[in-house]
């Protein structure tokens, strides 16, 4: 499968990488078998987190993992492990959670004080739930930037110097910034990506829904990661790939081009799909299935919301496995 694009150190190191690279966005190490776009194929290995085994388990489900290597970003004295894995329940009250480990193979240990961000944060908001954590390392600020939603109409930003304790920043996306009739703007991921023609250094991809109740992939661009401009037309439409709904997008970069990987709803196949958008986001080349979800547990016909990283040169995909709102966090190896 792929690798992420924005923090290029990961995959640009390819097979020569000796440390684990975070999965913000990079170029994947070559393998004998390749997925569309020349990315390595990923094969399911094991489940990393199961709701029933977690101390903080308000709803019996967890979604939307983001894995980040912190071994060379955070001071060793306060670091819990080489990798931080963020995830959340979705249903109320949700809550942004953290697990940590020293290898992308696992095991990951639950942070004992989850949730690290809750659905009530006075005086900033009080909502039914917060979920879908995406954490980006901001190299210029030397901070971990957390993008998350709550409600599904609103995507927010909080910032941290240690990846655990966050300070609220602002709303970065809500339905009022998209065309009339938009009902959801959530499940966002943000990546460093240069768009010179738009004077932008960051790109956001996210799920957008409207009154037709068919979910598409939206996108936007920003000079600073805080103030955004959003395309008023979807980046990927559900009908373009034969789905009722698409979501969980992630950018990847390989062979001097940019791709978006995203999931279909289970009824439409439950697979991860890939579309080449190009470095300037002018392409719409739908390349088909990126990862074919298995019918057996834990996937049970659905894989979603992938995050990517490398560990000692080996590419990994950490993703949501199983029925919508009944799944676990799984790991596949390239």
Show where each model-derived region lies:
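Donor nucleotide-activated moiety binding/catalytic core segment of transferases
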Residues: 246
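N-terminal secretory signal peptides
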Residues: 1-6, 17-24, 33
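Extracellular glycan/ECM-engagement signal in secreted proteins
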Residues: 303-306
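Beta-rich carbohydrate-recognition and catalytic domains
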Residues: 34-128, 136-186, 191-243, 253-300, ...
